[in-house]
Amino acid sequence: MEHKFVFIALAGALGTLARYSLAGFVQQFNSSFFPFGTLVVNITGCFAAGFLWTLFESRWAVSGEVRTFVLVGFMGAFTTFSAFILETGMLVRSTEWIYGIVNLLLQNSLGFGALMAGIVLGRLI
C-alpha cells in the first residue's frame, strides 16, 4: 500500500511540472492579464482526463494502479479542475445527471464564493 502513495506522489510531481511548463509557455505569448495559461491547462486537463478515462475503460487493459497513477496523481496535480469535470462526467454517464448538474453548480458557485471570502478575509488581516 505504501508504494501506491510513492507512485501517486511521483505522478503528482510530474503533473505539477507539466502544469507549470505549459501554463508558462502559453502565458509568455499573452500580453493581457487574463490567465490564458491556466485556461489552456484546465481545458487540456479536462480533455486528457476524459480521453484517458475512456481509453482505460474501453480500449486499454490497464490496472487500477495505472489508472490511479495517471488520473489521480498526474492529472490531479496537472489540474484539479480536470478531476472535478471528470467526476461530473462520471455522474452524468451513470445516469445521475441531476447530481452532475448540482456538482457543477455547487463547485462553481461555492468555489467562487470561497475565493471571494478569502479575498475579503485577506484584506481584513
Swiss-Prot record:
GO terms for molecular function: fluoride channel activity; metal ion binding. The chain crosses the membrane at residues 5-25, 33-53, 69-89, 101-121. The keyword Signal does not apply. Na(+) is not transported, but it plays an essential structural role and its presence is essential for fluoride channel function. Its main location: membrane. It is a multi-pass membrane protein. GO terms for biological process: cellular detoxification of fluoride. It holds the Pfam family CRCB. GO terms for cellular component: plasma membrane. Na(+) binds at residues 76, 79. Keywords: Cell inner membrane, Cell membrane, Ion channel, Ion transport, Membrane, Metal-binding, Sodium, Transmembrane, Transmembrane helix, Transport. InterPro entries: FluC (IPR003691). It catalyses: fluoride(in) = fluoride(out). It is found in: Cell inner membrane. Fluoride-specific ion channel. Important for reducing fluoride concentration in the cell, thus reducing its toxicity. Belongs to the fluoride channel Fluc/FEX (TC 1.A.43) family. This is Fluoride-specific ion channel FluC. It comes from Desulforapulum autotrophicum (strain ATCC 43914 / DSM 3382 / VKM B-1955 / HRM2) (Desulfobacterium autotrophicum). The gene is fluC.
